[in-house]
Design a protein with these regions (language model features):
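An N-terminal assembly and electron-transfer interface module characteristic of large anaerobic redox
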Residues: 1-179
Length: 179
């Protein structure tokens, strides 16, 4: 077999953020802020030597179904669900059930510590990344779909979380090599 036929393109990971569309009208600017955090997460993935396909925000069940079609057509090797705020499982369940991909949940809050003397609902929603993890895990279990990992930590300057992201990107590379 000629060497050029043995060379494979780089691994591709998919990523999508989850949110709750009801919040956008209640908290002007929240969606934009969360998408900045999502873009920063995408940059963390890109540093790992993988191609990244960003599917954007799933914030309703309708959007989840629309996104699912794009995910299935993309050929990604692994999928990250970026939990940027609380979101109902309806924005995640169709993707988990029908994508056929290994999924890793990421719950990386932007702030290392919340200033509870200044706390408000908006601040909570910007850092509420872990809240829906039990709900998502339960939904996946009821659908007999495995969630391969949950990466919990801070979005910025968190070596442990960065290491876990690197591990899963390396797993995506291995999965790609098996294709």
């Amino acid at each position: 077999i000629p060497m050029e036929n043995q060379i494979r393109k780089q691994a591709t990971v998919g990523v999508f953020a989850v949110g709750h569309a009801v919040y956008w009208g209640q908290f002007p600017g929240l969606l934009d802020k969360l998408m900045i955090y999502h873009a920063d997460f995408v940059k963390l993935l890109e540093k790992q030597g993988v191609k990244v396909v960003d599917f954007g925000m799933s914030d309703s069940s309708e959007r989840a179904y629309e996104m699912l079609d794009r995910i299935k057509a993309s050929g990604v090797d692994l999928l990250f669900c970026n939990m940027v705020t609380y979101a109902t499982s309806s924005v995640f369940a169709p993707i988990a059930r029908d994508s056929g991909l290994p999924i890793v949940l990421t719950a990386l809050q932007p702030l290392a510590n919340l200033d509870y003397t200044q706390a408000n609902t908006r601040m909570q929603l910007e850092n509420d990344c872990i809240c829906a993890v039990p709900e998502y895990m339960g939904v996946a279990a009821r659908m007999n779909r495995k969630i391969y990992d949950v990466i919990i930590g801070c979005l910025y300057n968190d070596e442990k979380a960065d290491g876990e992201i690197a591990k899963w990107c390396n797993i995506a590379k291995a999965l790609h090599g098996l294709k």
